[in-house]
């Protein structure tokens, strides 16, 4: 398994689609900055900027992003007609798939760190009040952790829709709808704790300072595990 994972990391150098992931992380931050221009009475500071980046990542960007990249990586062996050669090594498709999914999990963390960097750069440019090193570290931890938990939330979709070349695009659409559904689930705390997409927020205590927000870590963990 270690060799499979190492090989998949070597292959990443050939995958230009990874730049699409970087671009989508930038888009998440730019979209957040765009919404900050709306005169809706919200008071923007660095903490609120971070919260909005996390929300946009959850609802519109990351589930679709990681499903696209994971599906592309998994389908390459079929698209390039190399799967039959790999299986003669012999390596089972199950082991190959597991190795690719592990790499995708690492990528979700890397994209979280990239998104965190873009968020801090945006803060430096715009200059919202309340920026502190400790808050920046907390923001990086939360953004990165939420990305990883979102990956776990869409993992079943990726695994089920990547069996055939090209079919992963169906998974991308499903993942987008699945992520967008988090916007509606977030309106009810019971549903938010049960819905895997919003459960990722509960795992990092998103807006836990708000008395109306009551996360149940046990329920959130079970939701993601199932």
Question: Language-model features: where?
Answer:
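Aromatic- and glycine-rich beta-strand/loop motifs that create alpha-glucan
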Residues: 1-22, 163-166
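Membrane-helix interface segments
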Residues: 16-18, 92-94, 98, 164-170
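Pore- or pathway-lining transmembrane helices of multi-pass membrane proteins that form conduits
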Residues: 20-25, 165-182
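Secretory targeting signals
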Residues: 28-66, 98-163, 204-211
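Terminal transmembrane helical anchor/hairpin motif
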Residues: 31-50, 172-226
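Transmembrane alpha-helical segments in integral membrane proteins
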Residues: 66-78, 83, 154-169, 224-226
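Helix-loop-helix units of permease transmembrane domains in multi-pass membrane transporters
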Residues: 73-105
